[in-house]
Amino acid sequence: MYAANGCFYCHSQYIRDKDEGNDIDRKWGTRRTVARDYMFDQQVFLGTSRLGADLTNVGVRQTDPQWFYRLLYNPHTMSHEVSMPAYRWLFETREIQGQSSVDAVKLQGAIAPPPGYEVVPTSEGKALVEYLLSLKKNYPLPEAPETTE
């Protein structure tokens, strides 16, 4: 889902060394990314540019699936300066049958669904969020000591 939705065009998955950028200062990671970080990845997504945040450790920084669902549904509710498009095709609006779904996205204001309806992620939306939550390269490696500054 990450590749299919083109996330790698704007997001990278590598933390640059302190001498090469401010990734560590931005708290995107505590150490640089090294080749061993990608050893078990089926596909490596280094990225083609970095218009958005680096996602190497996004699963460490953000642990709530709701945060990702709200971001994907309407990025501008998270930040007005973001250039990320909405990925609303990863969601469906449906009538509430009995109780709300545990997966219902908590939306407010103009983007909230009408009364009696809820916005829920599709299986593709859930898969993308599960992938993003899994991005955690915060384990120690001898060839990339953590920066303590």
Task: Please give the residue ranges for each predicted region.
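Sequence/structural segment immediately N-terminal to covalent heme-attachment motifs in c-type
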Residues: M1-Q13
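Flexible coil segments in periplasmic/lumen-exposed cytochrome c-class electron-transfer proteins
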Residues: S12-R50, V60-P65, R70, N74-E149
